Swiss-Prot record:
Record key words, sorted: ATP-binding, Cytoplasm, Cytoskeleton, Hydrolase, Nucleotide-binding
Superkingdom: Eukaryota
Protein name stated in the entry: Actin, cytoplasmic
Lineage start: Eukaryota, Sar, Alveolata, Ciliophora, Intramacronucleata
Keyword Phosphoprotein: no
Job description of the protein: Actins are highly conserved proteins that are involved in various types of cell motility and are ubiquitously expressed in all eukaryotic cells.
Principal EC category: hydrolase
GO molecular function annotation: ATP binding; hydrolase activity
Keyword Nucleotide-binding among UniProt keywords: yes
Catalytic activity: ATP + H2O = ADP + phosphate + H(+)
CDD domains hit by this protein: ASKHA_NBD_actin (cd10224)
UniProt source species: Tetrahymena pyriformis
Principal location class: cytoplasm
Family that this chain belongs to: Belongs to the actin family.
EC number of the protein: 3.6.4.-
């Protein structure tokens, strides 16, 4: 492989979850929230070995006495000190590997600032001393995971949604579109909808309850207006949810009004296009000859595409925009929550990929900017 025969480590840094594992595996070994928690009041946790900060699941479990922070916002690392803690946790606690012995593949959102990639590279080589490193674009990896080399990926995670047209394994840079509207915004919007019926969730800890409600109960309506009408006429579709304190709340039309935001960002006053228009616009930026293949291979990826009914609705909305003779096919792989990671696992274990790594020697010679030459 590279310097040694150690398998590569693949880390998919999401705004909401960090997925990590060993190249060649078919699923990540660790998936934990990208959260750092610091005690609200130092010295309050009696009888526990108080740490200055908690990472991932542990922060999640103690969220009542912590202030929670996400170091990745909209797919971009905003706090490198916190991010370092997450990577450290990844290597030493979750995977139990020494980074000095393994090549490391990280992922990033398309159109990320150049400085962001350089800092990532610098941290990996200088803090963790990895022997070699690579950074790949998330959507391209998702397409690999679905077994295609041509298609358009609609990738929606916790912090950013993007549509990336890919032809023969190469992302077409002019046809990459992104909106900063994703899972975290849906969670906020869900809080707002529940507030309207008198349920007030506001703290960082309660937000996690809302996220759970969103993931368990929400779905995308095929026809929004008629769905609204159906809920007004009967309460058969209402679902109850038990809160951690034992109380039960009833979730009504919020179940589909929340994910509807993906198609109508105007609900929260955003002037973004919805994901159907984003997909269509991205395809229209491509060459006429390629469009047929793209319409026929719309691949969903990321946790925010896990809502039941989303594939059918996207297919319906894109069909309304596309030429009438065009065949539209939306692919929703069941493992799409992890497809970016799976694509990274496939890519980094290919024998043809082994020459692509940035080695420590190359980094020492050229500095962090080498990442723009070797990873595109």
């Amino acid at each position: 492989m590279t310097d040694s025969d150690s398998p590569a480590i693949v880390i998919d840094n999401g705004s909401g979850m960090c997925k990590a594992g060993i190249a060649g595996d078919d699923a990540p070994r660790a998936a934990f929230p990208s959260i750092i928690g610091r005690p609200k009041m130092p010295g309050i946790m009696v009888g526990m070995d108080q740490k200055e900060c908690y990472v991932g699941e542990e922060a999640q479990a103690k969220r009542g006495v912590l202030n929670l922070k996400y170091p990745i916002e909209h797919g971009i690392v905003t706090d490198y000190d916190d991010m370092e803690k997450i990577w450290h946790h990844c290597f030493y606690n979750e995977l139990r590997v020494t980074p000095e012995e393994h090549p490391c593949l990280l992922t990033e959102a398309p159109q990320n600032p150049k400085l962001n990639r350089e800092k990532m590279t610098k941290t990996m080589f200088e803090t963790f001393n990895v022997p070699s490193f690579y950074v790949a674009i998330q959507a391209v990896l998702s397409l690999y995971a679905s077994g295609r080399t041509t298609g358009i990926v609609v990738d929606s995670g916790d912090g950013v949604t993007h549509t990336v047209s890919i032809y023969e394994g190469y992302a077409l840079p002019h046809a990459i579109l992104r909106i900063d509207l994703a899972g975290r915004d849906l969670t906020e919007y869900c809080m707002k909808l529940l507030y309207e019926i008198g349920l007030n969730f506001s703290s960082t800890a309660e937000r996690e309850i809302i996220r759970d409600i969103k993931e368990k109960l929400c779905y995308v309506a095929l026809d929004y207006e008629s769905e609204l009408k159906a809920y007004k006429e009967s309460s058969t579709n209402d679902k109850s949810y038990e809160l951690p304190d034992g109380n039960t709340i009833t979730v009504q039309d919020q179940r589909f009004r929340c994910p509807e935001l993906l198609f109508k960002p105007a609900f929260i006053g955003k002037e973004f296009p919805g994901i159907h228009e984003l997909t269509f616009n991205s395809i229209m930026k491509c060459d006429v000859d390629v469009r047929k293949d793209l319409y026929n291979n719309i691949v969903l990826s990321g946790g925010t595409t896990m809502f039941p009914g989303i594939a059918e609705r996207l297919s319906k909305e894109v069909s309304a925009l596309a030429p009438s003779s065009m065949k539209i096919k939306v692919v929703a792989p069941p493992e799409r929550r992890y497809s970016v990671w799976i694509g990274g696992s496939i890519l980094s274990s290919l024998s043809t990929f082994q020459t692509m790594w940035i080695t420590k020697a190359e980094y020492d010679e050229s500095g962090p900017s080498i990442v723009h030459r070797k990873c595109f």
